[in-house]
């Protein structure tokens, strides 16, 4: 009976120790976190294309407003309304991009706990660099977002004043 209880205790301890070996490694968890961040940004490429198209359209409208405003004020009013709608659309796309990048940033922040658990220093340094790059990118986007948003507000004011 004593022999059986010792065997049971050793088996239980072995199972407990081995359970830690079979759980997900920090490297795997980190990979998943970075993958999730990348998935959050998936729509940003298409949003950037849409924003670019809207910018071109806005520039064309502005040029038409300037040209036609010299000749006919009535046709310009329609163009001014279109231009104001264009700025609103750009604001929506820009906000959507910001939300996607913020979600990605949250995923990157969640990766921090896995980076700390990595034992391989070379891999840890690489993970820190990736994390740092994401953070710098997020900061740069926020600065661009603030400037672009300010520009859109001024553009709207201009179109309102011209009406």
What is each stretch, according to the model?
Residues 1-8:
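Bacterial N-terminal signal peptides that target proteins for export
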Residues 12-13:
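Classic N-terminal secretory signal peptides
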Residues 16-20:
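C-terminal motif of bacterial Sec signal peptides marking the signal peptidase cleavage site
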Residues 22-95:
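Immediate post-signal-peptide N-terminus of mature secreted/exported proteins
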Residues 76, 90-163:
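Extended amphipathic alpha-helical interaction segments
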């Amino acid at each position: 009976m004593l022999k059986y209880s010792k065997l049971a205790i050793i088996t239980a301890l072995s199972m407990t120790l081995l359970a830690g070996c079979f759980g997900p490694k920090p490297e795997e968890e980190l990979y998943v976190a970075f993958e999730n961040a990348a998935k959050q940004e998936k729509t940003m490429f298409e949003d950037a294309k849409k924003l670019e198209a809207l910018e071109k359209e806005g520039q064309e409208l502005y040029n038409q407003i300037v040209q036609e405003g010299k000749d006919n004020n009535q046709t310009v009013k329609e163009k001014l309304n279109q231009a104001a709608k264009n700025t609103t659309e750009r604001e929506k796309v820009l906000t959507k991009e910001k939300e996607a990048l913020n979600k990605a940033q949250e995923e990157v922040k969640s990766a921090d706990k896995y980076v700390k658990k990595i034992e391989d220093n070379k891999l840890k340094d690489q993970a820190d660099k990736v994390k740092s790059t994401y953070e710098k990118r997020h900061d740069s986007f926020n600065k661009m977002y603030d400037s672009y948003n300010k520009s859109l507000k001024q553009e709207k004011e201009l179109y309102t004043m011209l009406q």
